[in-house]
Amino acid sequence: PTAGPEETAAPEPSPEASAAPEASDAPSGGKTLVVYYSATGNTQEAANLIAELTGGDLFELEPADPYTDEDLNYGDENSRVVYEHDNPDARDVALVQDTVDNWDEYDTVFLGYPIWWGIAAWPVDDFVTANDFTGKTVIPFCTSASSGLGESGELLAEVAGTGDWLEGQRFPSRVSREDV
């Protein structure tokens, strides 16, 4: 079953998570950027750990109209996130900033997000469509209590149209240094 936005219970890591590249597998060369959207802080924690381990810079994706706890109540059919889920045209979530200063200096981009109903949380889409990933290696990562990475990375790569998108990694909602 697919789950709503970032659940709280953290199961054991799935086999598919261990088959994906680890943060330490980032290609060597230019600078590393860790871009993330975090609705409840779980993805932010994973992003902080990846940045620490890779020496990467952090860039947080912030919706211009931030999600409240009520907005993220996927059990409430009247919540914002359920409305956006049921109405794909409503998923165009504007960001405070959708481009990164000195974007051309980065060769490796880790892109993090929670899984919402089996796909990347839609605030990430605005960032992906606003940037040219040509010449960049992109490593998606997600946080989820139960859902795997699924096709979220492939779908974002399709939206981007450029870049070398690797398989990626799923982390449990309560990520630890050992998980990364």
What name fits each language-model region?
Residues 1-180:
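Active-site-proximal alpha-helix that buttresses catalytic centers in soluble enzyme cores
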